[in-house]
Regions:
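An aromatic- and glycine-enriched ligand-binding surface/loop that stacks and positions planar moieties
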Residues: 1-5, 109, 117-120, 134-212
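Conserved, well-structured interaction surfaces
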Residues: 5-81, 97, 103-110, 116-129
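Generic structural signal for residues positioned in beta-strands
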Residues: 14, 85, 190-193
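Glycine-centered flexibility sites
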Residues: 64, 82-83, 133, 212
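Short, well-structured active-site flanking segments
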Residues: 78-90, 154-161
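Generic alpha-helical propensity signal that fires on short helical segments
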Residues: 84, 91, 104, 207-212
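Glycine- and aromatic-rich loop/turn segments at beta-sheet edges
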Residues: 85-86, 90, 120-131, 171-177
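Short glycine/proline- and charge-enriched loop/turn segments
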Residues: 90-97
């Protein structure tokens, strides 16, 4: 049964006031969800190189996508929490995972930058049809520009952003509001866009109908 009622937005108010207790579900969802994604990416990076039946093109695409997503999840984590445990291989047990200490922010950013650089060198320029929504070379470079900007490295942020602009694949809508029209999904401003389908559930936080 779905609860159609409202709420007082207490969790959002805590974020707005920069007074966030450990029990705030928005932070715990970000932490847990990111590490689920990181774990999946690490499994791909560990297992895919050994799959002999896979073509080299698909193998490289899978590895590039895994590095892109791992970087994206760590970028979300490091901005929210600062120092976080850095896992680049699957732990052998829950106990091993729990014992991994927090890694300094600078090292986490180094891994993010390396992953995005590797992904940009591997991924295709674009995808269509059933592959629409996969991470592309330009999504990786665009995210890398944002990472450099967050670090305050303006020259490298500008350099990477100019690469995306110079590709000629993206441009701005004359009306910013056009970004949010259903007809313009995966439009000319979109570097990376999560694909959804209707009808799986109506719960707004977990279990969304993601096609991936």
């Amino acid at each position: 049964m779905r609860d159609a009622g409202g709420g007082d937005g207490a969790e959002e108010q805590q974020l707005d006031n920069f007074n966030i207790p450990p029990s705030n579900p928005m932070t715990t969802r970000l932490w847990a969800g990111s590490y689920v994604g990181i774990g999946a990416a690490n499994l791909v990076l560990q297992k895919v190189p050994g799959i002999s039946s896979m073509s080299e093109a698909v193998r490289q695409r899978c590895l590039g996508e895994a590095k892109f997503l791992r970087a994206k999840y760590y970028f979300d984590l490091v901005r929210a929490f600062g120092d976080v445990p850095l896992l680049t291989t699957p732990p052998a047990s829950p106990a091993e995972a729990a014992a991994i200490p927090r890694t300094p922010t600078t090292q986490v950013y180094d891994q993010i930058i390396q992953d995005l650089t590797d992904a940009a060198a591997t991924l295709n320029d674009s995808y269509g049809g059933g592959d629409l929504g996969r991470a592309t070379k330009w999504a990786a470079i665009g995210l890398l520009a944002k990472v450099y900007l967050t670090q305050g490295n303006l020259p490298l942020a500008a350099q990477r952003a100019r690469e995306v602009i110079a590709s000629g694949r993206y441009s701005l809508w004359a009306d910013y509001g056009d970004n949010f029209k259903v007809a313009n999904e995966n439009g000319k401003e979109s570097l990376f866009e999560v694909q959804y389908i209707n009808g799986l559930n109506e719960y707004i936080f977990d279990g969304l109908g993601f096609v991936g």
